[in-house]
Regions:
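ABC ATP-binding cassette signature C-motif
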Residues: 1-240
Length: 240
């Protein structure tokens, strides 16, 4: 279980917005949420994220669960280039590869069979195991795959600060996909996608290892990417 709500209620400005909400999100779930404007979809997300708290009932989140959230128009600003920003996600992989290179260099300068050689060889083996487990050598391929799919293949050296709001939102989605959180929460993710990037995202999410919770008005996109859908009617959620 990643997130579970039981008899959850929430009011805004004295008006009841959500009443007796029940749902459970498990590892690997694909859930969609639809509903009209003002019926509490974003409020429900904020309750899930712990940004708001229910007035009645309970909501539980798995301890230590990594959650990635794409808000509507939820881009971010940075003076890094696109490539620099994506590489930051894999700082540990960079550290491991750098350490391996340093150990390789050190091994080449000590006699074989000695105590220092054995110590370095053990360190080399340990680093190699960590790198293999994390697929650190595949980092650049991962980044180029996601950036290419989302339309940034030829813009890796562009400074993020110079981009439009829609482009920054798409780039935030790229970052979330590369971070691979246990739960990916997407609020209207198709707003800034063209047909090509939309199709690519549908295919990518099909093989995503974590759980995905998507709010969208695009029912076709939901039908392609989720396994169950809730409709948020006034004050309650109903599974379709």
């Amino acid at each position: 279980m990643l997130i579970s709500a039981n008899e959850m209620c929430f009011s805004y400005a004295g008006e009841s917005l959500l009443e007796n909400i029940h749902f459970t999100l498990n590892e690997g779930d694909r859930v969609g949420l639809i509903g009209g404007n003002g019926e509490g979809k974003t409020t429900l997300i904020r309750l899930m994220l712990g940004e708001l708290y229910p007035e009645q009932g309970e909501i539980f989140k798995k301890s230590g669960a990594r959650v990635g959230y794409l808000a509507q128009n939820g881009g971010y600003d940075s003076y890094n280039t696109v490539w620099e920003e994506m590489l930051e996600i894999f700082a540990e992989d960079h550290r491991l590869l750098k350490s391996l290179s340093e150990v390789e260099n050190a091994i080449s300068q000590v006699p074989e069979g000695g105590e220092e050689y054995r110590r370095l060889a053990a360190r080399y083996e340990s680093l190699n195991k960590q790198i293999a487990a994390r697929d650190s050598y595949g980092v650049e391929v991962k980044i180029r795959t996601v950036l290419g799919g989302m339309g940034f293949a030829d813009r890796t050296e562009q400074v993020i600060h110079t981009m439009s709001g829609g482009e920054k939102t798409r780039l935030k989605l790229c970052r979330l996909l590369l971070e691979e959180p246990e739960l990916l929460v997407l609020d209207e993710p198709t707003n800034h996608l063209d047909v090509r990037t939309l199709f690519w995202l549908e295919e990518y999410l099909a093989s995503y290892k974590g759980a995905v919770f998507t709010v969208s008005h695009d029912r076709y996109f939901l039908d392609k990417t989720v396994r169950q859908i809730y409709e948020l009617e006034p004050k309650k959620a109903i599974r379709l």
